[in-house]
Amino acid sequence: MMKFNQPYYILNISPWPILMAFNSFNFMISNIMIMNFKFNMISMMNLMLMIIISILWWRDIIRESTFQGNHNFYIMNLIKLSMILFIISELFLFISFFWNFLHNSLAPSIDIGLNWPPKNINFFNPLMIPLLNTIILLTSSFTITLSHFYTLNNLKKKSSMFLNMTIILSIYFLYLQTLEYKQANFTFSDSIFGSSFYMATGFHGMHVIIGTIFLIINMMRMINMHFSFMHHISFELSIWYWHFIDIIWLFLYMTFYWWNN
């Protein structure tokens, strides 16, 4: 419904915010259970529920914006502002990870023998999988920019082609990151080094998963002709988010892989 004394669309009662909040809390608790009891079934269930809730929430937003036309100029500006604030909040989250890592590496504790990395930890070669992952993400940043360029020029086939390439590159990045974790000879519980590394790279990996889902949904919307060269705010926000992920990875690579090695 719309009030005539203001330009903003008043949302109907939606169950998705409270369900997402409860599910996010359960997801964090289940991750703690994984660290202590090595049991991940509850975590996988929470992850699947999070994906389902996100899809249903996206469905309602798409219906309100594309089919009902309730997202006017003011609402689109508010959505962009919300995305900027969200990215800033995520930036400060990663700053805390970098701060923690640099603090402990520049002044190692006596508990780990005043060494960084601690003894008996063989770290990854930064010129192997980490460098390949860096090239993959930089390439994906280039392909998503090309996709946006072709969208602005109303060349939908080329735009969808480069968007597909970006999605494939993101999935390949996640595969290589999983492979790297399997090859590691240290775990999350191996001193402050292991927890710092897995917290930072793990959270980045989770953001890559979210960004990939975001891109896949925009790919489906592009196929269904939801976007035009003038109106594609969802696609534009996913590009912002993807560039943010790429920039964070560059700092992760330079700090956690290159400088640390």
Name each model feature, range by range.
Residues 1-261:
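Core, highly hydrophobic multi-pass alpha-helical transmembrane subunits of bioenergetic inner membranes
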